[in-house]
Amino acid sequence: MLAVVLTACEKGPVEWRDDTRQLALPVSGPESSEAEAHLVLRADGSPALEPVVTVATMPADSAACPGSLRIAALSPTEIYGAWWSRRENGRAVLFSARSDNAGATWATTVPVDTTDRGTLSCERPAPSIAADSTSGYVHVTYFLNSPTGPGVFFAHSMDRGDLFHSPVPIMYGDRPSASAVTAADSLVIVAFEDPNSQRPQISLAMSRTWGHIFARERPAASTGTTSAERPLVALRAPQLVVGWRNGSAVTARVGTLN
């Protein structure tokens, strides 16, 4: 009886608010996309979309996949980028680089993941990148067909992007899936399209160890929606917000971490 009572009282990893909010993208023009905006949680707990940092130059890579560069700012001057670079036979390499002068110039390109065995080339979702000012770590998530199978993966650097640790699988699955990552010191949250779902849905992966180990649970974030894709995520512990693209707007759901 005790075991039954304890099980019934267990809470999920996130307690979601009942409502969702529609947020307009802070960009204009026919080419506008969520790549030009990032999700934030204000001090009052309300979600908002803000323009991403802009850079004067891009990291030098003649094989870079168009539109795949994603940017994260650790400070006004310390900027990180991650992008796909095409290779032969439909494969791609995930690269990163750091700028110490707000994107005017870039340091040496560093490989994040070179293990792709797929044939998607540049026809895959762009990576996501987050730079945490508290820990100084850089976190990257992406979809790739690895030697152990296709799926969503996570990798991070503990030394200002000079070296990335071996990738960690978030979820294996065949469907190319977009993802988003955010961090606040030891707490890392990954929002991702479920690569096994027939209908696009957003799930979460959580780590309280700077991304070294992720909890086994993959709680759903877009429950109650017919379709959710291209996730966004932001964190102001203990609150987090997850967003997904909905036409010309972003649907956002706020929750509290248990």
Where are these regions (language model features)?
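Extracellular, repeat-based ectodomains that mediate carbohydrate processing or recognition
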Residues: 10-258
